[in-house]
Amino acid sequence: VESMPDLNQHNPHLMKYLTQNSIWWIEYSGIDGIRMDTHPYVFFDSMAEWCKEIQNEYPDFNIVGECWYNTEAGSAYWQENSILDKTRNSHLKTVMDFPLQGIVREAFMSQTDSWTGLNKIYDRLALDFMYSDPMAVLTFLDNHDTDRFLSEEPDNLGFFKQAIAFLLTTRGIPQIYYGTEILMHGNKKESDGLVRLDFPGGFPGDKVNDFIAADRTPLQNEAFDFIQKILKWRKGNE
């Protein structure tokens, strides 16, 4: 669509409705978290109050804000208790680590020297001091709005395993985009739809069912088993 309607969230009656509506859906569905799309697009104070009210009602609930900035300063500004602006508080527990995501593919696919490769990751993590809570930052290799981590089907899983191991053992809250476990690949060059294809299997007309090992290729099973092993290890450790 060319445009979307705006709601005046400075209207207290509207904000009360939006907050009550959110609480109703959380209670009804039993979810434990919300990803708030384009979080910074709305009035800062309105979103801060919404986050605060939700957290007061559900202290263990998490809200992930899509704050798409290519710098740590841009992302960290929106996290609760930000050191970058102590005059106000967003009450947003988790922001997305787009600065790290933006360089992670190049970091693992290029040779490491003084400026490239894994040094790019070091440079990003060295700026963690900007976040009020780096452990609450959402880390990811890709999602529905970016190119997939794999632009094409790999011949081997060397750099892929390194990237997965890093994602699941570094600081923060890891997010794995569906299909990563079976090496789904593609980019947005022609269409966003190319990175949002259906997961093969379980749908009418699908020729393969990648939900089961028998239908996956040996390389897909290797990737699937590797991710599963690290996730089991992660789940069993603090």
Q: What does each model-identified segment do?
A:
Residues 1-19:
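Chitinase-like catalytic core of GlcNAc-active glycosidases
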Residues 21-23, 27, 32-132, 137, ...:
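Active-site-proximal helices and loops of the catalytic beta/alpha 8
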Residues 65, 172-180, 238:
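Acidic/polar loop patches that form or flank catalytic/metal-binding clefts of enzymes
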Residues 150-154:
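Short, solvent-exposed helix-loop connector elements
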Residues 160:
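Conserved interdomain hinge at the start of the Helicase C-terminal
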Residues 169:
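Conserved active-site segments centered on acidic
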